Amino acid sequence: MTVPARRALIPALVAATLLTGCGAKYDPQPSAQAAQAPSSSCVDTSGDSVKVGLLNSLSGTMAVSETTVNRSLNLAIEEINADGGVLGKELDPVTEDGASEPTVFAEKAAKLIRQDCVAAVFGGWTSASRKAMLPVFEAQDSLLFYPVQYEGLEASPNIFYTGATTNQQIVPALDHLREQGHRRIFLVGSDYVFPRTANRIINAYAAAHGMEVVGEEYVPMGSTEFSTIVNKLLASDADAVFNTLNGDSNVAFFRQYTSVGLEAGEMPVVSVSVAEEEVPGIGVENIAGQLTSWNYYQTVDTPENERFVRAFQDRYGGGRVTSDPMEAAYTSVHLWRAMVEKAGSFDVDAVREAADGTVVEAPEGTVEVDGETQHVTKTPRIGRIREDGLIETVEEAAEPVAPDPFLTGYDWADGVSG
């Protein structure tokens, strides 16, 4: 796993024609209405508290993953308030439900910014939700902290990306498969922008590294029927599966994968959207031994992670697990606090100006903001799901990897963003 050099910022991609979570063309109209030209910021910093927005899917197909992210955001806010707040002001969270619908995310983002007057918003999961919100935050000149791994090929002055970009998750997973001798991979994903873009990148990687994509299949978000895809898997002569399914579709996929006798030793599945929180719903008997690619697992051995896991379980119950998106969300609030206090102001321009080089010691390890791309350094980790449902690291980068969202450090990726 290598660390590409930082490159100059490439302008943000326009979201209007990209795919939504249901595979249809993204309709920019709801976001365009939400993203009306801003007046002056209504954020009120004159009192003893400042509002922040929490925007996650608390209902719908993504609630299985996003509800716990909301809990980790609240934990970070509680910790910060107990430690004196931000610039001496208590954080007052305003929670909204994105309902697993991109248009709802855009509408709720506009409400949080214009009506609730929040200083920043933390949330989103699917790339469809992020791309629906992007024009709102840009038009209103407000800040979104987006905590989930994504397909890259984007940078916005109004988004801080605290999850992994492609070179910090997808590429390390492909490197691992190749190093383990896998050459014939089958791609299965949800039908929206993240899986389709990730798979375009995977196809380019495979072509340059002597690997073959022997199948590529998509299902609508929330789909639970995988018999046709599993039969294609059986007939494909694949020796590994790269899984970009999101939400509760993973439950049905792994159960049907196991039901036909497939197993990790024969045809391993590497997943980039299955973490500790999803394992119980899938059933550990259906997924033990399978691989994941993230930057954080509950089993990561750092003092900060020991404190994080203990605090989360003390707050929400001893049997609760922690996961990469939860940790990245938790870290994003602490990063924002560090940026605001470095700037000495809640002002968006001042916070952006202070962002570059801001460092926090997070549960996953050292995280540093790259001010050019507004992404962060991450430590790639390949994990294997254990019989107890936790994930153990089987390969880890020697040091945090700088973000390269446009893959400019990889010759094989030329033209991928076009």
Named regions from a protein language model:
Residues 112-125, 145-147, 186-189, 237-247, ...:
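Periplasmic-binding protein-like
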Residues 107, 151-152, 157-260, 299-307:
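Extracellular/periplasmic Venus flytrap/periplasmic-binding protein
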Residues 22-32:
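Bacterial lipoprotein signal-peptidase II cleavage site
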Residues 257-330, 341-346, 397-418:
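Extracellular/periplasmic periplasmic-binding protein-like sensory domains
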Residues 45, 71-93, 207-210:
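Signal peptide-proximal N-terminal region
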Residues 314-323, 337-395, 399:
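Segments of small-molecule ligand-sensing domains
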Residues 36-74, 96-103, 125, 189-196, ...:
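Extracytoplasmic "Venus flytrap"
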Residues 28, 37-38, 64-71, 84-153, ...:
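Beta-alpha junction/loop-to-helix N-cap segments that form part of ligand/metal-binding clefts
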